[in-house]
């Protein structure tokens, strides 16, 4: 018996949605057999990998419609960094009852990967482990989570339109246009930017400075700022995420603390030579025109991890950024609400201070809002943040 969950997901070009609602989600082989004209989203390397993997009965993955348990995955990220815009894509939600079909197959990762096992329903001993990827928010190559988060339900030939429960798109304007394109059929079209690695909201304060509510580690900024202490411990908050997802950053952080290169009021810039896009996208190392480097700015907001954050040290660090960003080659910058949340400082104090300094930068800057509690709208206004 399969545990219940809400939906599975199919990633497609938004122009294909009307046809999908009429004919269903077809396997690529079935699309070719029926000579259906559709907009393809996958490049040749992805196509060849899926065509070439054969099952024991000699069927190719090309004969199956593939549904993901978690659509916010490396494959979707790849499509977006290859040049497709969020508005070009739709995520088709499929009722979990498709799993009751006896002819489906389940994979424990990206089906095209040689490391992935493909199971019949009767062969699976613990489906919960596979389905748990629906709760994953990020991934790494080293521990296999990058492959596992792309676990699939493979449906032979076609997913009947009756199984389709909703369509997710990137914003309200796209949703409105799609509703018209499908003649306002009785199916929900839901704008959800987080599915497409977009922030929940963005508030533009100046030409270069914005407030963002979302996951900073999916920012396309060249330099990501991480709040740290000066004793080399990454235990909670964003720092603990960095320690797990980017262990090389943690090693550099500890070394900088030991050598006193990172001090209170003086951030340390780690000019990492690898691309976050390559790290996050499926087969990202083979893609061209990526963000070539993702740097990390280690910004001390407290002296010891046991202490609360100190506003004076934060101001000194902001001053360092203003004085050094050009010389260091920082081209764009993402910064969390320094010292807020676990640091114990209030946005009403930190926000205006950060904006006072960061408005001086002649580069794109995103301030990521604290998620621990909702900030009153009045404290997010240009008047409050820029005129204080």
Curated annotation (Swiss-Prot):
Keyword tags: DNA-binding, Glycosyltransferase, Hydrolase, Nucleotidyltransferase, Toxin-antitoxin system, Transferase
Catalytic residues identified in the record: 50 (proton acceptor), 152
Residue positions binding ADP-D-ribose: 215-216, 227-229, 301, 339-343, 371-372
PROSITE patterns attached to this UniProt entry: DART (PS52018), MACRO (PS51154)
Region of interest (NAD(+)-binding element), ranges: 34-52
Family annotation (InterPro entries): ADP-ribose_metab_enzymes, DarT, Macro_dom, Macro_dom-like
Reaction(s) the record says it catalyses: an N-(ADP-alpha-D-ribosyl)-thymidine in DNA + H2O = a thymidine in DNA + ADP-D-ribose; a thymidine in DNA + NAD(+) = an N-(ADP-alpha-D-ribosyl)-thymidine in DNA + nicotinamide + H(+)
Catalytic activity, EC: 2.4.2.-, 3.2.2.-
Gene3D superfamilies: Leucine Aminopeptidase, subunit E, domain 1
Stretches for region ADP-ribosylating turn-turn loop: 107-152
UniProt GO BP: peptidyl-glutamate ADP-deribosylation
Domain Macro: 196-376
Residues the entry annotates as binding NAD(+): 10-12, 50
Domain DarT, first and last residues per copy: 6-197
GO molecular function: DNA binding; glycosyltransferase activity; hydrolase activity; nucleotidyltransferase activity
The family this protein is said to belong to: In the N-terminal section; belongs to the DarT ADP-ribosyltransferase family.
Function description: A fusion protein of the toxic and antitoxin components of a hybrid type II/IV toxin-antitoxin (TA) system. The N-terminal domain ADP-ribosylates ssDNA on a thymidine residue, while the C-terminal domain removes the modification, neutralizing the toxic effect.
Entry remark concerning the domains of this protein: The NAD(+)-binding element stabilizes the ADP-ribosylating turn-turn (ARTT) loop which confers substrate specificity; both domains contribute to ssDNA-binding.
Full protein name: DNA ADP-ribosyl transferase-DNA ADP-ribosyl glycohydrolase fusion protein
UniProt organism field: Thermosipho africanus (strain H17ap60334)
Chain's gene name: darTG
């Amino acid at each position: 018996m399969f545990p219940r969950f809400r939906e599975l997901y199919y990633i497609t070009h938004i122009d294909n949605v009307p046809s999908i609602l009429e004919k269903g989600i077809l396997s690529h082989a079935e699309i070719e057999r029926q000579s259906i004209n559709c907009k393809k989203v996958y490049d040749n390397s992805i196509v060849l990998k899926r065509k070439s993997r054969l099952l024991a009965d000699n069927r190719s993955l090309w004969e199956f419609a593939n549904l993901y348990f978690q659509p916010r995955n490396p494959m979707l990220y790849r499509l977006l960094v290859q040049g497709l815009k969020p508005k070009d894509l739709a995520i088709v939600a499929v009722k979990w009852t498709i799993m009751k079909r006896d002819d489906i197959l389940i994979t424990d990762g990206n089906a095209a990967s040689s490391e992935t096992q493909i199971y019949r329903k009767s062969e699976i001993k613990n489906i919960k482990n596979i389905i748990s990827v629906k709760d994953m928010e990020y991934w790494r190559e080293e521990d296999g989570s990058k492959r596992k988060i792309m676990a699939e339900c493979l449906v032979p030939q076609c997913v009947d339109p009756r199984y389709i429960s909703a369509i997710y798109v990137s914003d309200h304007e796209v949703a409105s246009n799609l509703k018209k394109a499908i003649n306002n059929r009785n199916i929900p079209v839901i704008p959800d930017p987080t599915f497409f690695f977009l922030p929940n909201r963005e508030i533009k304060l100046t030409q270069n400075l914005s407030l963002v509510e979302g996951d900073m580690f999916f920012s396309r900024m060249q330099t990501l700022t991480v709040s740290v202490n000066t004793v080399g411990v990454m235990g909670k908050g964003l720092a603990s995420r960095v320690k797990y997802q980017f262990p090389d950053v943690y090693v550099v952080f500890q070394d900088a603390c030991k050598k006193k290169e990172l001090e209170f009021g003086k951030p340390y810039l780690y000019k990492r030579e690898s691309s976050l896009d390559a790290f996050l996208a499926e087969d990202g190392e083979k893609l061209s025109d990526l963000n070539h480097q993702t740097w990390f700015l280690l910004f001390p907001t407290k002296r010891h991890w046991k202490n609360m954050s100190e506003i004076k040290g934060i101001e000194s660090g902001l001053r360092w950024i203003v004085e050094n960003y050009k010389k260091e080659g920082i081209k764009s910058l993402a910064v969390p609400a320094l010292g807020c949340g676990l640091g114990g400082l209030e946005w009403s104090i930190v926000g205006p201070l950060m904006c006072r300094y960061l408005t001086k930068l002649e580069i794109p800057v995103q301030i990521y809002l604290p998620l621990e509690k909702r900030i009153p709208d009045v404290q997010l206004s240009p008047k409050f943040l820029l005129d204080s």
